[in-house]
Amino acid sequence: MSSKLNALFSDSYVDVSQYRDQHFKGNRYEQEKLLKQANTLYVGNLSFYTTEEQVYELFSKSGDVKRIIIGLDKVKKTACGFCFVEYYTRTDAENAMRFVNGTRLDDRIIRTDWDAGFKEGRQYGRGKSGGQVRDEYRQDYDPARGGYGKVVSRP
């Protein structure tokens, strides 16, 4: 089948993205296999003030949510703008990828991606200051994500 014809039958919302967890314990093939079977989603671009209840309210519209793990700043132990949403079934997770990715939550456009499965310790930000790496180098002022970036100089 031609690549154009394949694109017509592809469900780009459900396809596995190019992103790979650099801290995954295993090889790329093993990670790819887990992602294709996963029922867990990574959710990014959340406000630091978004609650677990708000996440549940939105994501439960796509199916039965098993659990939500809010991402925490590893130093302050406060929310740092991401979470994991685990569903009971792959089908429900696929529905969330189709219908929730790119929507607004707490006045922010959120993004979802497949996750190979939550492991203890992954709920913490990986940035040097304890939060997410992307927030350390952000140059714009974003009050919903802690103001200015932590590493860049402020005006």
Swiss-Prot record:
CDD domains: RRM_NCBP2. One of its GO terms (biological process) is regulation of translation. Gene3D superfamilies: 3.30.70.330. GO terms for molecular function: mRNA binding; RNA 7-methylguanosine cap binding; snRNA binding. MRNA binds at residues 19, 42, 111-115, 122-126, 132-133. Residues 122-155 are annotated as: Disordered. Component of the cap-binding complex (CBC), which binds co-transcriptionally to the 5' cap of pre-mRNAs and is involved in various processes such as pre-mRNA splicing, translation regulation, nonsense-mediated mRNA decay, RNA-mediated gene silencing (RNAi) by microRNAs (miRNAs) and mRNA export. The CBC complex is involved in mRNA export from the nucleus, leading to the recruitment of the mRNA export machinery to the 5' end of mRNA and to mRNA export in a 5' to 3' direction through the nuclear pore. InterPro entries: NCBP2 (IPR027157), NCBP2_RRM (IPR034148), Nucleotide-bd_a/b_plait_sf (IPR012677), RBD_domain_sf (IPR035979), RRM_dom (IPR000504). It holds the Pfam family RRM_1. This is Nuclear cap-binding protein subunit 2. Residues 39-117 form the RRM domain. It is found in: Nucleus; Cytoplasm. One of its GO terms (cellular component) is nuclear cap binding complex. Belongs to the RRM NCBP2 family. Keywords: Cytoplasm, mRNA processing, mRNA splicing, mRNA transport, Nonsense-mediated mRNA decay, Nucleus, RNA-binding, RNA-mediated gene silencing, Translation regulation, Transport. Component of the nuclear cap-binding complex (CBC), a heterodimer composed of ncbp1/cbp80 and ncbp2/cbp20 that interacts with m7GpppG-capped RNA. Residues 133-143 have a biased composition (Basic and acidic residues).
